[in-house]
Amino acid sequence: MPSLGLGTWQAPPGQVNQAVCDALELGYRHVDCASLYGNEAEIGAALQRAFQSGLVQREELWITSKLWNDCHAPEQVRPALLRSLRDLGLEHLDLYLIHWPVVHRHGVLMPERASEQIPLEQMPLQDTWRAMEALVDEGLVREIGVSNFSAIKIDSLLQHARRRPTVNQVERHPWLQQNALLGYCQHQGIQLTAYSPLGSSSSNGQPSLLDDPVICAIAEEHRASPPQVLLAWGLATGTAVIPKSVHRDRLASNL
């Protein structure tokens, strides 16, 4: 898996297609997707453009998607994957993740009441994981992993797993370093991938990591941009990073 990839969370509709094409032209070979993001069909159109033009071959790319919380029932896992494959226009994924260790009732994307959630005691993660393992057996997925899992959740999963998670994808940056989780994953041979490596989106006047005085000072000293400093920190500390942008100049700068 390439250590630097393109994140597509909150990529605006109508812009992500061109962003993916630009990223592939610039040299990105890792694209991170998820059914929840609602843009896999647009990403798929960009991938098909790239394949048909000869820009890249399928085997050159690493494509990740994620199982949403309302499809944890074992009988729902394969259909959810097939929908992502259909939208992306692919025959297989390189990596498929359980998006969160949380279960919603089927068809509920974002629960508004407790009754729309299902306790893990009623739908254990290990049952979902067995269905994920079956996707690898079938050749629909090369690797499987998790996202937003704590060390405790991974430990519990490992007690029942036939295949170990390849990746745990979590938010990680200098303001949320998660070093204990990083050390745990490294000990277990699990690659930690950092989403929001440039910090969470700021709003309501909250400070931005990109404006952090220490980050800005390091950037100035090394004649780099704050995003370049943050991505270098993530890579140097052992994580893969998947920054998101739909702007070609920023995509180039992040490489």
Annotate each PLM feature.
Residues 1-61, 78, 131, 198-202:
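N-terminal binding-site loop/beta-alpha segment at the start of enzyme catalytic domains
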Residues 2-15, 66-75, 116-123:
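Active-site mouth loops of central-metabolism enzymes
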Residues 11-24, 73-88, 125-127, 152-156, ...:
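Short, acidic/polar
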Residues 30, 92-95, 143, 167:
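Residues at the N-termini of beta-strands
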Residues 49-59, 88-90, 135-140, 160-164:
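Short helix-capping segments at alpha-helix termini
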Residues 57-71, 95-101, 169-172:
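A short, structured active-site edge motif that brings together acidic residues
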Residues 69, 101-255:
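Beta/alpha (TIM)-barrel catalytic core signal, keyed to glycine-rich beta->alpha loops juxtaposed to Asp/Glu
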Residues 77-98, 134-138:
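CE4/NodB-like, metal-dependent polysaccharide N-deacetylase domain
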